[in-house]
């Protein structure tokens, strides 16, 4: 990396014009990839890549269930899973969000009010799914366990509906279910790990197998950041909300 290169970094406290990032979490962007796409894709993209390549390695032909399939991470998961050859089933709250998930590759999208277990069994001919990616938590965990196939994997990586009730581990025994509580940074401890997974994500983006989904852009200001936070918490958005830094006077 040289001065003047365009880079993307995984760093906190980034509502700022300048940030300090560790070298181990900075990636040089290829010329084919613009900064807007990289920023929109990076955090959720890395989450999706590690979920599908490490937490559970998706194989061609797998049946995959993605809860909250129209959210930022959900849309990335749908696309990465499809790129790996999976049959993707998503869940979401509205028909509008369902259409968005289908546009980006979901084979079937169910609404939370539907009979999720019955529909999944119908789609999978009663076999269940190989893996469930669950970022919802409390309101979906029981369904997630029920729709899994024999030797299936349940990856919990969020709790948007609240923390699940304590899980009696004996419920995992009948189908030999593998259960994981996922944390992204657990797969990015070293520079080698970060470069490995970021390289996979860059390849997916440059090859157009994965597309960043931008909901809206906001200026870096007190009002802009407040509006973005309020819309994010409303759970009415799909995809990413970006904060844009206004150009400096000499750049305007």
Report residues per predicted region.
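Short glycine-centered segments of the SAM/dcSAM-binding site in methyltransferase folds
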Residues: 6, 63, 87, 152-153, ...
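NAD(P)H dinucleotide-binding glycine-rich loop of Rossmann-like/cofactor-binding domains
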Residues: 6-70
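Short, glycine/polar-rich helix-capping loops at beta-to-alpha or helix-loop-helix junctions
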Residues: 14-17, 92-100, 164-169
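Helix-to-beta-strand junctions that scaffold the AdoMet/dcAdoMet cofactor pocket
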Residues: 59, 148-149
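Adenosine-nucleotide cofactor-binding segment
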Residues: 66, 82-143, 192-194
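N-terminal Rossmann NAD(P)H-binding glycine-rich loop of SDR-like oxidoreductase domains
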Residues: 70, 74, 78
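Rossmann-fold dehydrogenase core element
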Residues: 150-155, 167-212, 236
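C-terminal hydrophobic helical "lid"/dimerization subdomain
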Residues: 192-252
């Amino acid at each position: 990396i040289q001065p003047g290169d365009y880079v993307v970094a995984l760093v906190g406290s980034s509502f700022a014009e300048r940030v300090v990032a560790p070298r181990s979490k900075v990636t040089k962007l290829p010329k084919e990839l613009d900064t807007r796409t990289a920023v929109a894709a990076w955090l959720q993209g890395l989450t999706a890549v590690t979920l599908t390549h490490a937490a559970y390695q998706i194989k061609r032909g797998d049946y995959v269930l993605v809860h909250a399939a129209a959210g930022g991470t959900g849309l990335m998961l749908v696309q990465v899973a499809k790129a790996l050859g999976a049959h993707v089933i998503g869940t979401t709250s509205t028909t509008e969000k369902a259409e968005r998930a289908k546009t980006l590759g979901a084979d079937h999208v169910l609404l939370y009010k539907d009979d999720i277990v019955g529909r999944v069994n119908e789609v999978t001919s009663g076999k269940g799914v190989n893996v469930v990616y669950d970022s919802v938590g409390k309101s979906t965990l029981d369904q997630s366990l029920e729709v899994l196939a024999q030797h299936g994997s349940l990856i919990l990586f969020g709790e948007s509906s609240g923390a699940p009730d304590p899980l009696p581990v004996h419920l995992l025994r009948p189908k030999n279910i593998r259960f994981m509580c996922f944390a992204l940074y657990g797969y990015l401890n070293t520079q080698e790990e970060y470069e490995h997974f970021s390289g996979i994500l860059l390849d997916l983006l440059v090859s157009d197998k994965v597309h960043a989904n931008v909901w809206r852009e906001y200026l870096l200001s007190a009002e802009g950041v407040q509006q973005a936070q309020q819309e994010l918490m409303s759970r009415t958005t799909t995809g990413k909300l970006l904060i844009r830094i206004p150009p400096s006077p000499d750049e305007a």
